């Protein structure tokens, strides 16, 4: 299937609602009602976060955030979280939306065999609060989540419990969520995701070398730089000045590495949209390249209240929220935290796999070095969910 066709699926499910039956016209039409009217939800969210901290690494998982917002809407008297994701509740029922997220979660876990991905939501509430049984049953059924009672008055102990729970759920990959709470809360939702993949064409660890990464005009850091040569999907964009390549993971994961021209990061980020991805997909062609990509691990933590205040759902995270469908104790003050972690390395070498193409090719390859700030977009090709979006400013 071509990247252009995949882009059509992205148009239908930027917020992550697509099913295995999407290949048929009938099923496709049935899911158009679930597709958000704002198909650029993921890009808008990403662009906002980069604008807040343009000189820092940015990492989010749009599909994980979408699931968290949909889960919180269960039983809530307000529907702005679903509407902000683009759902028309006059055409699609809330039950259908939650069933689709349930199926999406299943598809991601079943289809991404080449990705080590731990994604989920954990709820923590005051010991004296009582959530309704119907709400607890729904979050477990649709989102495989649970609610744990802790003592927020002893915040040191409470934060340790939260961190340990997420550490256990991610098999030790995410060890720390947060230590401070900016404002009092009676209900904390932690949305987390860890991702690491196996490249379809893995890098050879023997070729990894220490090289310079130019953070800005005055700052340079040393990073382990992975190297391989071969035929890779490539495009040089003169309209939105950048170079980009696409690399697949084993299974259904795929990654777009986007290298803006000097001083053009803001221009390229502002141009990210469904139409831009569609255009790139049509113009990308295989090219012999010498590819240099830094090996790194980055993580980011966000207060969703700060992230979502421009998406018309900030009332969900304030004292004005009505969670009468969720708890017998209202009003309820909600804090939502998003924690994302990405590990990018050579990838485990599978039996019978090759460690990239030889470093010396007959034709003269193009050198592409990601040795300055770049953009990284990770998708699931089967559902075309936005797994990760990142601006990598300093991989050291």
Curated annotation (Swiss-Prot):
Subcellular location field: Secreted
Family annotation (Gene3D superfamilies): Alpha-1-antitrypsin, domain 1, Antithrombin, subunit I, domain 2
Signal sequence extent: 1-22
Chief location: secreted
Keyword Secreted: yes
Pfam families (UniProt xref): Serpin (PF00079)
Result when mutating residue 36 to A: Increased affinity for corticosteroids
UniProt binding sites for cortisol: 246, 278, 384
Positions bearing carbohydrate: 88, 216, 252, 319, 352
Tissue specificity remark: Expressed by the liver; secreted in plasma.
Annotated site residues (Conserved cysteine within steroid binding domain) in this chain: 242
A molecular function GO annotation: steroid binding
Entry keyword set: Glycoprotein, Lipid-binding, Secreted, Signal, Steroid-binding, Transport
Entry's Gene Ontology BP terms: glucocorticoid metabolic process
GO cellular component, one term: extracellular space
Impact upon substituting residue 32 to A: Loss of corticosteroid binding
Known role: Major transport protein for glucocorticoids and progestins in the blood of almost all vertebrate species.
PANTHER family recorded: CORTICOSTEROID-BINDING GLOBULIN, SERINE PROTEASE INHIBITOR, SERPIN
Protein name, as recorded: Corticosteroid-binding globulin
Organism: Rattus norvegicus (Rat)
Lineage of source species: Eukaryota, Metazoa, Chordata, Craniata, Vertebrata
Gene: Serpina6
């Amino acid at each position: 299937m071509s990247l252009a066709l995949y882009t059509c699926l992205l148009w239908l499910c930027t917020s992550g609602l697509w099913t295995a039956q999407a290949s048929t016209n009938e099923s496709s039409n049935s899911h158009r009602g679930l597709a958000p009217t704002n198909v650029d939800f993921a890009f808008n969210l990403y662009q906002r976060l980069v604008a807040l901290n343009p000189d820092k690494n940015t990492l989010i998982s749009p599909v994980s955030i979408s699931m968290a917002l949909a889960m919180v809407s269960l039983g809530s008297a307000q529907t702005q979280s679903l509407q902000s994701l683009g759902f028309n509740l006059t055409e699609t029922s809330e039950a259908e939306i939650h069933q689709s997220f349930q199926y999406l979660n299943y598809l991601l876990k079943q289809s991404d065999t080449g990705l080590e991905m731990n994604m989920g939501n954990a709820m923590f509430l005051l010991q004296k609060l009582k959530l309704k049984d119907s709400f607890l049953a729904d979050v477990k059924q649709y989102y495989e989540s649970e609610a744990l009672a802790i003592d927020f008055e002893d915040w040191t102990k409470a934060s340790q419990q939260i961190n340990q729970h997420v550490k256990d759920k991610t098999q030790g990959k995410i060890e720390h969520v947060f230590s401070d709470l900016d404002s009092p809360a009676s209900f904390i939702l932690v949305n987390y995701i860890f991702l690491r993949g196996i490249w379809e064409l893995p890098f050879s660890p023997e070729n990894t070398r220490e090289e310079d990464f130019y953070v800005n005009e005055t700052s340079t850091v040393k990073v382990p730089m992975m190297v391989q040569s071969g035929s890779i999907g490539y495009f040089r964009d003169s309209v939105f000045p950048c170079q980009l390549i696409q690399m697949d993971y084993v299974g259904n994961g795929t990654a777009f590495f986007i290298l803006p021209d000097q001083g053009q990061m803001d221009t390229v980020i502002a141009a990210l949209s469904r139409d831009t991805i569609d255009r790139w997909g049509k113009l990308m062609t295989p090219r012999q390249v010498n590819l240099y990509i830094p090996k790194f691990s980055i993580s980011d933590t966000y207060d969703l209240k700060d992230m979502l205040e421009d998406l018309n759902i900030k009332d969900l995270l304030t004292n004005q929220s009505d969670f009468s469908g969720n708890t017998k104790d209202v009003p309820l003050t909600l804090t939502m935290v998003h924690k994302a972690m990405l590990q990018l390395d050579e990838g485990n070498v599978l039996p019978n796999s090759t460690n990239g193409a030889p470093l010396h090719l007959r034709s003269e390859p193009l050198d592409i070095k990601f040795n300055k700030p770049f953009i990284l977009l990770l998708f699931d090709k089967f559902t075309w969910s936005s797994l990760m979006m990142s601006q990598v400013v300093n991989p050291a």
